[in-house]
Amino acid sequence: MYGDLANKLILEAKRTQQLNQRRVNEDLQSGGGVNLLSRLPIYHDELVRNILNEVDQLRRNAEFLRNNGNAEEFAHLDEKIVKCQYFVTLLCMERNKRCLLAYQKLRTDILDNIAWCNNGTGIELYSGSNEDETNSLSHYEQEYLKEYGELITELKSESMADIDLSGSLEPPSDVFIDVRVLKDAGEIQTEYGVFNLIKDSQFFVRQSDVERLIQQGYLQKI
């Protein structure tokens, strides 16, 4: 039945949205920052293509009804019935388009967050060493994430180099915080000295100095 494929796509988008929100809440509760990696399930390329084919079929049906509504083969039908068929066909076609746009918009929003939270290096951090993560993106999504990250990097390296555009919009509740190192990150230079971030060690540091490391999963706020 027309519309069933689009309904499957929307259900998949809703599951992705709910899963993302649950992971965000878990990340915030753990104090380790919001980890945006490995967020997206695999892109349903075949399902999207089938919906596009269905839209094309509906378009041809609508054109046929519009151009042949008064033909002899429809003479035995009431004019209102033909118009109703035409209208319902258009509704099905538009609904499929809206479902496709909603699916793409959700995935694009997540890709935008990945790029911003990783200072424009989203594609490198997203792919990492795990090929499954890269394979979850379509070819066009990989290109989009790469080029969007390049735009962010270019923007931050020019007139706004002194402003942390990717920083949190919420003011910190504490200037200094206790953090635990979740994985080795080497030495970092701050205004208050050098810290050697070794796994399982703890430090009392200024939050603004380590906020990026918290978001990237190197540190956890205690």
UniProtKB/Swiss-Prot annotation:
Pfam family name, one: Sld5
GO cellular component: CMG complex; GINS complex; nuclear replication fork
Domain of life according to the entry: Eukaryota
UniProt subcellular location: Nucleus
SUPFAM superfamilies recorded: GINS helical bundle-like
Cited Gene3D superfamilies: 1.20.58.1030
GO biological process, one term: double-strand break repair via break-induced replication
Keywords recorded for this protein, A-Z: DNA replication, Nucleus
Alphabetized PANTHER family for the sequence: DNA REPLICATION COMPLEX GINS PROTEIN PSF1 (PTHR12914:SF2), PARTNER OF SLD5 (PTHR12914)
Family statement: Belongs to the GINS1/PSF1 family.
Function: The GINS complex plays an essential role in the initiation of DNA replication.
Complex and partners: Component of the GINS complex which is a heterotetramer of SLD5, PSF1, PSF2 and PSF3.
Protein name in the entry: DNA replication complex GINS protein PSF1
Annotated source species: Candida glabrata (strain ATCC 2001 / BCRC 20586 / JCM 3761 / NBRC 0622 / NRRL Y-65 / CBS 138)
